[in-house]
């Protein structure tokens, strides 16, 4: 069974976690000129 040899320090774990960044979703302009999130149904036109 795989067991770590020693405990990972808080600073080392935080340094590893710096690479996991959250990206903000970018809204796109629809055919009718309204802004919507990509891959969502537009409430005004009903298009995907």
From Swiss-Prot:
InterPro entries: Ribosomal_bL32, Ribosomal_bL32_bact, Ribosomal_zn-bd. Residues 28-48 are annotated as: Disordered. One of its GO terms (biological process) is translation. GO terms for molecular function: structural constituent of ribosome. The keyword Disulfide bond does not apply. GO terms for cellular component: large ribosomal subunit. It holds the Pfam family Ribosomal_L32p. The keyword Transferase does not apply. SUPFAM superfamilies: Zn-binding ribosomal proteins (SSF57829). Keywords: Ribonucleoprotein, Ribosomal protein. Belongs to the bacterial ribosomal protein bL32 family. This is Large ribosomal subunit protein bL32. The gene is rpmF.
């Amino acid at each position: 069974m795989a067991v770590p040899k020693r405990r990972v320090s808080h600073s080392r774990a935080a340094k590893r976690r710096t690479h996991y960044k959250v990206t903000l979703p970018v809204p796109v302009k629809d055919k009718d000129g309204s802004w919507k999130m990509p891959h969502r149904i537009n409430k005004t036109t009903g298009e995907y």
